């Protein structure tokens, strides 16, 4: 019998020791203590993408680029060029430029020309600044006042001077940014051409790399800072996808994992990003980004997170993505399965033949150990209320429907004023659980029981009172001081909690796994790599029937 399908049979000699060990523990017990599409690429020649830096630089009152030399330019039809260089010994501070302005009717082809005119107007004792509108397109704005009346007072001082004509009064448009350097300032107005400029580092770090320094984090590529319709500033990193992956792979998978597992992560992260955003670098004020640097997309911490081991994995798989049926596909992944991955239909309700549940028995060193989460009655009620699911006083917590892999698909909460049924991913979100592979234990339950079949028929026994044969062949008594027992079956793992709460006001959630369970298990991929599988084989296993190919071909 093949535990992992035909893929494993091809490696039978190399893996025999591992498979035999798994079979030995078919009913042996291990003791464990407490402890998500957009559009695909249409232009394979252009590999810059846009990543929203929402984790640290989204919706801020100000963002500072600490570099002393930066270049300003616009990306038009996926082609960027630096139009102007700026220097500042104190770096560059970007803030929203809300307020009322008048604009000179005349346009200017350079910052220098616009600044000369602005300087003349400033001699009248008013605020006048050059404004970046687009490539070779500058204006001069006067004002920046909190009220229209204040702006009109300024206009009264300048309207008959120097022969300049002005626009009508312009209120805040949600797209203006003020940039302050050590001895000068200028404005950016993204609304006129529906685009913001992008900035690149012109000074080099100690390793000779041009890296933009935003304080807590540094980034390769370019940075775009805009308001995007809000009274705050947000940074977007425009970066080559391979350089982006340098900052993703070590954040999504431990850099000390096997090199083949790191390659799996690199290919999957590349596929995920390309399916989410395609190749697109141009500014778009109506949608700053589709991909961000958090778990909502993929965790990305930029240049400072890079590791030589994960960089090598990215380089070794350069340009490769996951394909199914001749098309690039989204590659979902997660930390730990707890014995088996899950069908995508059981998690998000959609169908995808390559995202089927598969046994994950090489996940022998899980990144996330089996876990226990305890809630009091009042804590459960607060969680429900915070998600607008109030049921009054909680009476019972009942896993109502289980998937074939042992995950809770429907969880019923029975309360004094009604019932609420939570489904799949909502369960994790509401109760902050690592996964949906769990058992609920209440006062009075005898959780560590299992039914064994013998010569005298079925018998219910307590695991804590049993002796077990380990994978090494030794016989030991169960350790009763640990929180739950993990039993390895032919194609999954099962958990048996040891203890029940002493109070009727408590519920224990005993579980395994970490993440949604769809696609590739990172811990399992590492186990398969250690057992001798290559990254292409691992990908084809977790994404059933999928292959690795060159993006854009």
Label every PLM stretch briefly.
Residues 2-553:
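Conserved, single-site charged/polar hotspot
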